[in-house]
Amino acid sequence: MKSKKPLKITMEDSRRLNDPAEQGGLCPAPVGPSYSEAWGYFHLDPAQPRHRMMSAWATCRLCGLQVGGLPNFQMWTRALCQHLSDVHLPELKKSAAPSSPTTMPCPPPPSPTMAAEGDWARLLEQMGELAMRGSQRELELERREAALMQAELELERKRQALKQEAQSVEQERHQLQVEREALSKWIKKQSPGAQVPEPPSPLPLLPKEDPDIHDNNSDNDMVTKVLL
């Protein structure tokens, strides 16, 4: 009489089945004849499609137990082989069928602390030196760019200051010209018959000279001639 009680496999068991480290460091062999022979002892539930492995069940042809609900084909095969080796090992030995998939020890992982030797060591050393030089050059370039930007900002500030100073000088010259014209009109009104020379046109200012000194002297000379 076949039993319909399914074989329960927890998530922890599935993780251990899928993790070689949990099995004593043994790596599973690739899918081959032994795996296909293990599947020969089971038949799938016809009510479920083959690709929906999480909801399908495989029924053992020897005892009727059901194994299933696993996410991938490899874990399914491991569970089937484990069931055969745990429950039907005598039958498998008699029929000379493999009781479990062929396993081989996993190669040890490369040690991260293993020292490099020979050409590889020299190559690593050269790469480290190049990386250090590149980092130093990048830092130096950043410093130079920052200094150049600071110099450009300072130059722009000086240009703005010179522009404002030139505008101020131009305004002063215009104001001085207006005052000269007003003074000439006042002198003509005070002495109608006197010959008052026209005020000269303003000369361009020389650097580092005070235009007020020359203007005051010319005004004093003009007033002196009129009084005489």
UniProtKB/Swiss-Prot annotation:
Residues 95-114, 183-228 are annotated as: Disordered. A motif (PPPSP motif) lies at residues 108-112. Expressed in the liver (at protein level). Abundantly expressed in muscle, with lower expression in brain, fat, and heart. Expressed in the spleen, lungs and kidney. Abundantly expressed in ovaries and testis, with lower expression in the uterus. InterPro entries: ZBED2/3, Znf_C2H2_sf. Dual phosphorylation on serine and tyrosine residues of the cytoplasmic PPPSP motif by GSK3 and CK1 may be required for AXIN1-binding. Its main location: cytoplasm. The keyword 4Fe-4S does not apply. GO terms for molecular function: zinc ion binding. Residues 132-185 form a coiled coil. One of its GO terms (cellular component) is membrane. Residues 207-217 have a biased composition (Basic and acidic residues). Keywords: Coiled coil, Cytoplasm, Membrane, Metal-binding, Phosphoprotein, Secreted, Wnt signaling pathway, Zinc, Zinc-finger. It is found in: Cytoplasm; Membrane; Secreted. Associates with the subcortical maternal complex (SCMC) composed of at least NLRP5, KHDC3, OOEP, and TLE6 via interaction with NLRP5 and TLE6. Interacts (via PPPSP motif) with AXIN1; the interaction is direct, enhanced by protein kinase GSK3B and casein kinase CSNK1E activities and decreases GSK3B-induced beta-catenin serine and threonine phosphorylations. Acts as a positive regulator in the activation of the canonical Wnt/beta-catenin signaling pathway by stabilizing cytoplasmic beta-catenin. Involved in transcription activation of Wnt target gene expression. Plays a role in symmetric division of blastomeres in the early stages of embryogenesis via regulation of mitotic spindle central positioning and organization of the F-actin filament network. Plays a role in regulating the distribution of cellular organelles, via modulation of cytoskeletal dynamics and cytoplasmic lattice formation. This is Zinc finger BED domain-containing protein 3. It comes from Mus musculus (Mouse). The gene is Zbed3.
